[in-house]
């Protein structure tokens, strides 16, 4: 909902909304609707804005499942542009714990940004996933899954960088992620590898 960042800076609860796609505009619109119900009717609401989620059971067409699925199938792994777009990745289990904390303890009418300060370029993320696959399910020819990475034309409206400052939820609600990114990513790769029936 906040739009895109350049090479520096972070989004916080004080950042203005600046959605750049119909998808993000619909999310911003939902936030405005909820906020208006609080101000008009006193409805007990809280709003959360999160960084990119990952973990088991995510839709197959999302970035991380796509990288895993394509690599295991020996197909080209598509990476938009040069892979320099940056995302702050949030493990789904940590996201759920944050939502629960906000639901139980957040101030009515307030917004809480949920992130982990874990920025990754898409290409670096793809390399990490391929390295995990190399360790968990080595290729029979001894090669690396990195060999399947293929750069494709960037998609329209692709925001360059997202980075969130979770200071408010950390200080006011004492929430912190419980999983290290590398461990959560390895767990995620293993889950998809088993789901796709690659041992």
Regions found by a protein language model. Name each.
Residues 1-47, 54, 58-60:
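Catalytic helix-loop patch of NAD(P)-dependent Rossmann-fold dehydrogenases
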Residues 52-53, 85:
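A short, flexible beta-alpha/helix-coil linker loop
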Residues 53, 61-62, 145-146:
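Short secondary-structure boundary micro-motifs
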Residues 65, 71-199:
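C-terminal substrate-binding subdomain of Rossmann-fold SDR/epimerase-dehydratase oxidoreductases
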């Amino acid at each position: 909902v906040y739009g895109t960042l350049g090479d520096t800076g972070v989004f916080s609860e004080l950042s203005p909304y600046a959605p750049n796609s119909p998808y993000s505009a619909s999310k911003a619109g939902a936030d405005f609707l909820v906020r208006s119900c609080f101000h008009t009717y006193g409805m007990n609401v809280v709003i959360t804005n999160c960084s990119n989620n990952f973990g088991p059971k995510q839709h197959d067409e999302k970035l991380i499942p796509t990288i895993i699925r394509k690599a295991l199938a020996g197909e080209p792994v598509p990476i938009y542009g040069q892979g320099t777009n940056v995302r702050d990745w949030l493990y789904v289990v940590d996201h759920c714990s944050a939502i629960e904390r906000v639901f139980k303890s957040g101030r009515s009418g307030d917004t809480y940004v949920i992130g982990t300060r874990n920025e990754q370029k898409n290409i670096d993320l793809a390399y990490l996933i391929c390295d995990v696959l190399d360790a968990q399910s080595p290729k029979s020819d001894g090669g690396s899954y990195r060999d399947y990475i293929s750069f494709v034309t960037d998609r329209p409206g692709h925001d360059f960088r997202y980075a969130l400052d979770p200071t408010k939820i950390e200080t006011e609600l004492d929430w912190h992620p419980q999983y290290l990114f590398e461990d959560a990513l390895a767990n995620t790769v293993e889950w998809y590898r088993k789901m796709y029936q690659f041992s």
